[in-house]
Amino acid sequence: PQNPKTPFYHIYYNNKMLKALTLAACVLLNVQAAPAEDEFTILPNMTAMSTKSYSGYLPVTDSKALHYIFVESKNQPTTDPVVIWFNGGPGCSSLLAFFQENGPWVVGADGNNTIYENPYPWNNNASMLWIESPAGVGYSIANNTADRSTNDMVQSQDAIVALQAWYNKFPEFWDNPLFVSGESYAGIYVPYLTWQIYQYNMKANMTGQKSMNIKGFMVGNGATNWDFDVSPSFPETIWNFNLIPKKYIDFFNANNCTYYFNDFRNHTGPASCDPVWDAMQNLTSALNWYDLYRTTEAPITAEERIGKTMVAGQEKTYKRGMSQKEYTPWAKFANDRVANDFLSDYVNNETVREALHIPSYAPGWDMCWGSQFSYNLQNEASMWIYPILKGAGYKLMFYSGDTDGAVPTYGTKRWLQELNWPVKKAWRPWLTQGQVSGYIEQYDGLDFVTVKGVGHMAPQWARQPVTDMITAWIHGQDF
């Protein structure tokens, strides 16, 4: 769609999708409970999983399948909500969250080459479903060239087909409350999938089929409106963090200088904006853009970046970790410090692959996909979906680690102003064990929550506060 005001939620609901949804709804009536072939009970260097856990594939087409991990709630899996999680990118693996942010175990987080049990996993009071999306990301399968090119709409269409395949495997969770969640570029994925579920339910209601028990979504530090998010909000953010001199921000504001995520739009302002933009990025190039107050990782050599593993007697290669320059392609002068090389080695280990039921023909696991894939950004982003889902009565939450330089809180507050929804409960602190963990402002239709003193990966860097906050919210409790 080219016009975000066009009611195009009918346009994309084509016959192919309708047939797929109808078939899936029918199949759901004739399936067995949780697939034994997908269950795993332990991973290397960990103790046994404390709840039932599964890893396998969700078919989308004959040539595409999305890898998932599902871990049941420790509390009441028969009634607790199911929460879907996506990482962003676009093109980064949700195993990053499973192994470092909100899963049962923590592997190699923050430069520490250790494995330990997460004391605050999200599955304490919810069943968690991590999906590697789009096809080709991580251990998800994309078998031909066409499968390796996608966009926001196609990704969401694939995701709902995969979700139906998941319900096929786990029909006993059909009645549990369902929430969709994610961070970063999943600020696009999450509203889009929720909107697809909304459409699925409209059709189900018209045809007498059972609808999904969707309740709402949660987005963390997510891209939502390209007029404000990522690059457009970076200058004001680094000025407010005292990282650049006043003359730079004054020049930008006086000359209407605006740059956009991955340069997919032409920047505004005169050519004289360019050297000032470069100077801003140079001054911040040595920082951790994902948490402006957090240290960067130690450098490693190019040779150390190439990982090798043996799978079924054959050598597979993979990229060890990601540099900030690779992870932040819009940052012209970002540093080459590499994070998560330990995690890359762990996930690519043959024993780990076997435990997760990864087929031997699947390639090595990379944190984010490479140049053989293409993702075509759509100009609309996802803010247009918010009023639709508000009208449907869904709960919406946006939380933001307030030291993020990649998708800054400043940009989020600007598009929230653009929504122009009335405030129901004024800005106030929320606490964890008597300490301020951030602030919350409740709009008519959306809860906006900041997480104090952490950046882009708030569930990783503020484990207890974010887990407590998310748990309370999905269970309808105050925090």
Positions of the model-derived regions?
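Intrinsically disordered, low-complexity polyampholyte segments enriched for Lys and acidic residues
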Residues: 5, 14-19
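A short, hydrophobic C-terminal helix/tail in secreted or cell-surface proteins
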Residues: 1-11
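Terminal and linker regions of secretory-pathway proteins
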Residues: 18-479
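Repetitive helical segments and hydrophobic/amphipathic motifs
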Residues: 11-14, 28
